[in-house]
UniProtKB/Swiss-Prot annotation:
It comes from Pelodictyon phaeoclathratiforme (strain DSM 5477 / BU-1). F-type ATPases have 2 components, F(1) - the catalytic core - and F(0) - the membrane proton channel. F(1) has five subunits: alpha(3), beta(3), gamma(1), delta(1), epsilon(1). F(0) has four main subunits: a(1), b(2) and c(10-14). The alpha and beta chains form an alternating ring which encloses part of the gamma chain. F(1) is attached to F(0) by a central stalk formed by the gamma and epsilon chains, while a peripheral stalk is formed by the delta and b chains. It is found in: Cell inner membrane. NCBIfam families: ATP_synt_b (TIGR01144), PRK14472.1 (NF011042). Pfam families: ATP-synt_B (PF00430). Belongs to the ATPase B chain family. GO terms for molecular function: proton-transporting ATP synthase activity, rotational mechanism; proton-transporting ATPase activity, rotational mechanism. This is ATP synthase subunit b. The keyword Nucleotide-binding does not apply. The chain crosses the membrane at residues 20-40. Gene3D superfamilies: F1F0 ATP synthase subunit B, membrane domain (1.20.5.620). It is a single-pass membrane protein. GO terms for cellular component: plasma membrane; proton-transporting ATP synthase complex. F(1)F(0) ATP synthase produces ATP from ADP in the presence of a proton or sodium gradient. F-type ATPases consist of two structural domains, F(1) containing the extramembraneous catalytic core and F(0) containing the membrane proton channel, linked together by a central stalk and a peripheral stalk. During catalysis, ATP synthesis in the catalytic domain of F(1) is coupled via a rotary mechanism of the central stalk subunits to proton translocation. Component of the F(0) channel, it forms part of the peripheral stalk, linking F(1) to F(0).
Length: 175
């Protein structure tokens, strides 16, 4: 019996039954219509909503990327300008420092030359004064010596005493 039941089942599945095909097709169409009415709209709506969300995210990502690239370009330009400006400022600072150093050096050299000239003039004046004083002293001594010579008669001892006296006078006046 088992064998005959299996054969019956196998025979009915393998042989096309027009009623079964009809009812299967009707059931498929009904299920398809029910799914279309109940589930197809929400599924398609959810898929479209999801697609819009994804497209919106992609668009935002593209615009953010473009915006960040624009900001990056602008920052690079600003950085290049800042570098150029800093180089210019440094160059101007160095030029100013060089000019200032040259001016200060020139002024210092000029001042040193003036000080040297002033010192030379003062030394020359002091030298002249000293020579004038020395001449006056020598003249005074010569006059005094001549006075002494004239007042007394000169012998060898007397001459020696006069010269010694003049030397003493000269040394006491210097000190």
């Amino acid at each position: 019996m088992l064998t005959s039941g299996i054969i019956l089942l196998a025979g009915s599945l393998l042989s096309p039954n027009p009623g079964l095909i009809f009812w299967t097709a009707i059931t498929f169409v009904i299920v398809l219509l029910i799914l279309k009415k109940i589930a197809w709209g929400p599924i398609i709506g959810a898929l479209e909503e999801r697609e819009k969300g994804i497209q919106s995210s992609i668009d935002r990502a593209h615009s953010a990327k473009e915006e960040s690239e624009a900001i990056l370009r602008k920052n690079r330009e600003l950085l290049a300008k800042a570098d150029a400006e800093s180089d210019k400022i440094i160059r101007e600072g160095k030029d100013y420092a060089d000019k200032l150093r040259a001016d200060i050096t020139e002024k210092a050299q000029s001042e040193a030359k003036k000080m040297i000239a002033t010192a030379k003039d003062e030394i020359e004046q002091e030298k002249r004064r000293a020579l004038d004083v020395l001449r006056n002293e020598v003249a005074d001594l010569a006059v005094k010596g001549a006075e002494k010579i004239i007042k007394t008669t000169l012998d060898a001892d007397m001459q020696k005493k006069i010269v010694d006296s003049m030397i003493q006078d000269l040394s006491t006046k210097r000190n």
